[in-house]
């Protein structure tokens, strides 16, 4: 249920797509492979990212929609809509276990109604008819039910119960109005916070608004939009925080490596890297996030590609780590208490 925060979209996938099917001999399998490889080639310019962990999901969906007939879902080698920009805005994939607590799937408030139909757009890479989509739709309620049943893993280390209880009081006074309450009677306000208020990198929300006339309208007018709706807003949704300790990095673009830095903007590095491992030694149990190495330069100053793709540069467009400065007003003791409380969610 946890999004892959280390997924690698830094390479052109079209070369490997062409190689995958060389050992096939069955004509039907070869035809399916060639169809898939051709679509990988068509979309690959729109899903290549400069850093590991940055996900191009929104751009991929837009590129797929551009090649699809909205009524029949038939693939067109010639784009039917203007294609999205090749520089994809990054998103950090949310944990699936938050899905049951919110009405919108996406950071910008889009993806309401039947989430199953929205999830199914991932199949538009190879689904070519409404009949094929309906066959998937027949069993997708079970997929949706499974995803809604997911729960976060418990914090694997000791918790200071007294400190966590003090943190709950601070959290409910300062954070709950946006992120909800937890415990026996949980609540979630399901708000969209305007960009001017939250102050986080605006590129994702701005892009959703800019291309809505093409891609949002395509979805809402298609078979998928008969039950689901894409209605992006000019702001971001504060996520539910169940299992938040396990979901680093933070903000919608993954620009902040730890919750400690999220609660104190002075701790946020402009340029940082990590091991991209998943062992206990790769996790910072004090700061709640990844063990991070701060560096003194961004992508422009890193000639080695292997190092560059592991370097998060917050000066790149769409990768900014500003905003969400609400925790700056807390004392150090209050922030420590909130961190302890978040371990219990």
PLM regions: where:
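Periplasmic c-type cytochrome electron-transfer domains
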Residues: 1-345
């Amino acid at each position: 249920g946890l999004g892959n925060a280390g997924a690698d979209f830094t390479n052109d996938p079209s070369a490997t797509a062409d190689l995958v099917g060389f050992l096939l001999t069955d004509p039907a399998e070869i035809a399916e492979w060639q169809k898939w490889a051709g679509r990988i080639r068509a979309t690959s310019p729109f899903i290549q990212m400069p850093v590991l962990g940055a996900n191009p999901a929104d751009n991929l969906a837009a590129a797929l929609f551009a090649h699809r007939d909205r009524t029949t879902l038939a693939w067109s080698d010639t784009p039917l809509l203007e294609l999205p920009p090749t520089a994809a805005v990054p998103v950090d994939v949310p944990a699936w276990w938050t899905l049951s607590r919110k009405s919108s799937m996406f950071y910008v408030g889009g993806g309401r109604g039947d989430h199953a139909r929205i999830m199914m757009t991932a199949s538009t890479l190879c689904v070519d008819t409404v009949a094929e989509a309906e066959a998937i739709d027949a069993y997708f309620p079970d997929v949706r039910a499974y995803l809604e049943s997911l729960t976060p893993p418990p914090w694997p280390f000791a918790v200071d119960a007294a400190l966590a209880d003090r943190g709950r009081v601070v959290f409910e006074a300062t954070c709950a109005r946006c992120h909800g309450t937890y415990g026996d009677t949980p609540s979630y306000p399901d708000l969209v916070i305007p960009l001017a208020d939250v102050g986080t990198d605006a590129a994702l929300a701005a892009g959703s608004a800019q291309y809505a006339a093409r891609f949002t309208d395509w979805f809402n007018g298609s078979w998928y939009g008969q039950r689901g709706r894409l209605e992006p807003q000019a702001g971001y949704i504060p996520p539910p925080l169940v299992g938040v300790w396990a979901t680093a990095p933070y903000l919608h673009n993954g620009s902040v490596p730890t919750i400690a830095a999220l609660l104190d903007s002075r701790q946020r590095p402009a340029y940082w890297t990590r091991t991209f491992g998943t062992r206990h030694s790769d996790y910072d149990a004090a700061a709640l996030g990844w063990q991070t190495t701060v560096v003194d330069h961004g992508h422009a100053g890193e000639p080695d590609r292997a190092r560059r793709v592991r370097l998060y540069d917050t000066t790149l467009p769409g990768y900014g780590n500003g905003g969400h400065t609400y925790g700056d007003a807390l004392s150090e003791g209050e922030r420590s208490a909130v961190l302890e409380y978040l371990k219990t969610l």
